[in-house]
Amino acid sequence: MAGTIVADTLTHSTAGSLTTDYVVEGTVKHRGHYNQFGVTVSSLTDSLNNSSISDNGTGDVTVNRTTAFSNTGYSSSGGTNYNGVVMFSSAGGSYTTSATQILTKTTSTLAAAENNNTSFMLSGALA
């Protein structure tokens, strides 16, 4: 059974209202979790809108989306455990709507590092 909900505005009884554009634009559209520590990454352990992941070397992966963003102005956030930092880069030298490069590094020297339990979230408008 298929259904449709049509709403232009969400209204709260005491907090006012909000147009649904904010909800649609602001939700996570691509997310994932992977472990790179001591292994070649070939898949995500959990994901949304992910078509593939490529292990480019130490602390360097590229994630590809099933459905692309409508532009390259999407937002990114990520984290990893064990004294690491997650950085987002341009896949192939320039930001693209269909892929994002993720770099994991140590917090002390910013050297490339293979960290476990790395997660990322990207939000923006889908094409």
Please tell me what each predicted stretch does.
Residues 68-81:
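Short, surface-exposed, low-complexity cationic segments
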Residues 3-69, 108-127:
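Extracellular receptor-binding modules and their adjoining Ser/Thr/Gly/Asp/Asn-rich linkers
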Residues 2, 30-33, 87-94:
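A generic short-segment signal for beta-strand/edge and adjacent turn/coil regions
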Residues 79-127:
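Extracellular jelly-roll beta-sandwich "head" domains, especially the C-terminal globular C1q domain
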